[in-house]
Amino acid sequence: MGWKGNRTPSNSQEGYYVGLMNACGYRTKDLEKPVIGIVNSFTDVNPGHRAFKELVGYVKEGVWAAGGTPAEFNVPAPCDGMAQGEGMHFILPSRDLIAGSIQAMASAHGFDGLVFLCSCDKIVPGMLMAAAALNKPCMFLTAGSMLPYEADEGTYVTPDLKESIGQRNIDAISEETFTRFRENICFSCGTCSMYGTANTMGVFAEVIGLCPIDSTTMLFCSSAKYKQARDVGERIVTLTKEGVRFSDVVTEASLKNGLRHVAATGGSTNAQLHICALARVMGIPMDLAAFDAIQRDVPCVAKFKPSSKFNMYDYYKAGGVGATMKAIERYLDPDARLATGGTVGEFLARFRRRVDPEIIHTADEPLYPDGCFAVLHGNLAPGGCIVKKSGVVPEMFHHRGPAVCFDSEDALRAAMTEKSVKPGDVLVIRYEGPKGGPGMREMSIPAAMLVGMGLHTSCAMVTDGRYSGATRGPCIGHVSPEAWDGGPIAAVRDGDMIEIDIDKHTIHLEVSDEELAERLGHIKRPAHPAPGVLGVYRKAVDSVNEGCTWLYGKEE
């Protein structure tokens, strides 16, 4: 049986559609081919997405060469790094907005297949959610990583710039050095060369089968990237003609493969939100407990900036994603399908790259035997919370200290700027959860400042908000229930002792149950306005444990 598209140009009922597409420069005979929507997240104001202005042309060439017709449209691509402070309220909500806008556009225009061009923190998961909701033939392509900055003192990448803010705050570096870092560390286009959320989710898209292997870790300017773009353009036409849909490639087994790989490589804690959200769109049950059970089942064999000295290009040169997949091969489902062709097992059987054992360990001699995350429970977080243990120094796996409370990230940042944080403190940042923020802001700059100020070996952070994927140190996030919903974190007072034990997976507020209940009865929420879309988000957002979806996952 021959291929049949979603639109039939020869049908007179499609005359209006054909006429309007002719107005865009398409010929009628072009519309008789597979029409491939190119979902482009190019923007001038996000280095991880700027390269798509050029790459999209190579994808289109591949589509035309394989007998398809490319049709490009664009979606927003906000940069987490730029959206600090007030702007950060909008970042996590933007994930579902991106997914919804793509679903609307692709459904309205009836594209036969889709290529998703994405790189950064909320754009990759937003596009994955859209792909799952649409269930069309699809492939993904990421832009590749940013060039490192080579200086006399060493090699620097983006997290070093964030940490230098803290260094400058205590005069550990000069204004001249800080200015040089600010103007040079972000050395080129491409995703920030660290294993933050962008690269965690980009690599996840590779392992679950939608994106060419090493698309994320290779340099954005590599000739291999342009070849990949053409290959993706050609391959999507084949998948479309063969009727291979998202659900034929990405199954529950694929999802678990991707999660295991995240845990094996020291990924971002934000992966918990995004993988649970994607699973929800796919109709697969997954919450924090299920996420933890899967990630604890695999050893952590690698970790990258800022949790180690190795950046994304080091990862690529050390063997890349194929090498880390090979290291945990026995934990992966070999029958999971790859959109590029074949299965995970077949790909790993062919894998022959040289592997650097200093960077990529074996499963028998791992960095950690049970994943890179620790999910903690206790009276401060009855619903759980999460920390990236692979980014915590061993001496901080257990910490007990007095609480210093802040009802917003802004208040914390002011205290750190004024240098009022003391060694031993447990910094409690609340009313920054999904509803309380609203938007579940990440404590990106404060966490980096903590490192830059040398306090990450003596202070801990605890929040119902979240952290940048490029965070290191004892930074516990996603505390549930959140303060806005009356969670125990709302009742913590300055000076209360908090004990954190990562090995035992516990977090305990040294206050009696009776005292805690009495305090919670007198809590008053602070004024955290929710204008426009944030008001809708506050009313609609689901639990952090299930991924903070707000446009997806509800029963209709």
Label the model's feature ranges.
Residues M1-R50, L55-A77, G81, G85-I91, ...:
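Catalytic or ion-coupling anion/metal-binding cores of large enzyme and transporter domains
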